[in-house]
Swiss-Prot record:
Organism (species): Syntrophomonas wolfei subsp. wolfei (strain DSM 2245B / Goettingen)
Reaction equations catalysed: Release of signal peptides from bacterial membrane prolipoproteins. Hydrolyzes -Xaa-Yaa-Zaa-|-(S,diacylglyceryl)Cys-, in which Xaa is hydrophobic (preferably Leu), and Yaa (Ala or Ser) and Zaa (Gly or Ala) have small, neutral side chains
Family: Belongs to the peptidase A8 family.
Top EC class of this enzyme: hydrolase
InterPro entries with a match to the protein in the record: Peptidase_A8 (IPR001872)
HAMAP family given in the database record: LspA
Intracellular or extracellular location(s): Cell membrane
Pathway annotation from the record: Protein modification; lipoprotein biosynthesis (signal peptide cleavage)
Protein's recorded name: Lipoprotein signal peptidase
Length: 149
């Protein structure tokens, strides 16, 4: 349930936030939330994370689809811990959010701008947070196995 809960929450919040950006901003329009620190800037990202490899949308679309399918199968077939399910749900939900953008628009809608980092979105944040949590879980599990060996 944690997988599907985090998965659906990420997809829903991502879609709502991007719909608001599309309705409220012109491309490249920026508004300050916290002067010098946080802006909302509408960017059409045609590449991968941070705008890398522009023009390869088909590659990212297929990759995201494979990741989502693998994570759904993993959670369906394994006895993932609640934190594993949460982390993989965040990753899969973020991947689906960006996949939906690529399918309907041919680009990903990015809008969170820290001023010193490439512009990103809620789906990207979910992927990163889920990935970090999963990495921590793997590292902790490895240390536990070393102690038990």
């Amino acid at each position: 349930m944690r997988f599907w809960g985090s998965f659906l929450l990420v997809v829903i919040l991502d879609r709502i936030s991007k719909a608001w950006v599309l309705a409220s901003f012109l491309p490249r329009e920026s508004r300050s939330l916290i002067e010098g620190g946080l802006y909302l800037t509408y960017v059409q990202n045609r590449g991968a994370a941070f705008g890398l490899m522009p023009g390869k949308s088909w590659l990212f679309f297929i990759s995201a689809l494979l990741v989502i399918m693998a994570l759904v199968i993993y959670n369906w077939r394994s006895k993932a811990s609640p934190l594993e399910a949460l982390s993989t749900g965040l990753i899969a939900g973020g991947a689906l959010g960006n996949l939906i953008d690529r399918y309907f628009y041919g680009f990903v809608i990015d809008f969170i701008d820290l001023g010193w980092w490439p512009v990103f979105n809620l789906a990207d944040s979910a992927i990163v947070c889920g990935g970090i949590l999963l990495l921590i879980l793997v590292l902790l599990d490895g240390k536990r196995e070393e102690r038990n060996a």
